[in-house]
Amino acid sequence: MLVFIRRVTQTTTVSEVTAEYIREEHVHILQHKEIPAYVGIFRIHGPFLFGATDKIDVIVNRLPNLPPIIILRLRNMTAIDSTGLQSLENLADRIHESRRQLILCGTREQPALRMREAKFHEHVGAEKICNSLAEALDRARELSPEAVKRHPAGSAWGRRNTDLPSAAAAAAGSAEA
């Protein structure tokens, strides 16, 4: 049983959705879309079970340097158990304590059911649980004035426009002129 748990949790990853990640994918919902500078996007890929919950530290350890709104994409999180739910609640608390906003999106059937049973929406706010990444980005735009104002670093992020292939090409073209 322990060997099974270990192998399953080895397949789980928590990572930031970066410009490089988007470009490496063949088709990605974020291709040709601007990620606002005040938004950071992370994803959980694989089952988020006992034994894999420490992988959320990828976000926690970077929290002081992250923008005021964090979107956690759960589309590829195939399963969650009570330890995973507790870890997500702890993450939500840490993000809230840092005066940032957390938006969850794209939850699959099994994790969504477990989250509903645990009343997770009461912990983070039902308005911060979205069906899709597009909906989460819209919600982030609605929250942005409040989040940017509340966050000490305000609008110190300017990296996202240049992350886009078209913006980077335009910048390179104007630099050559």
Across the structure, where does each feature detected by a protein language model lie?
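Canonical bilayer-spanning transmembrane alpha-helix
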Residues: 1-9
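Cytosolic C-terminal regulatory domains/tails of membrane transporters and channels
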Residues: 9-177
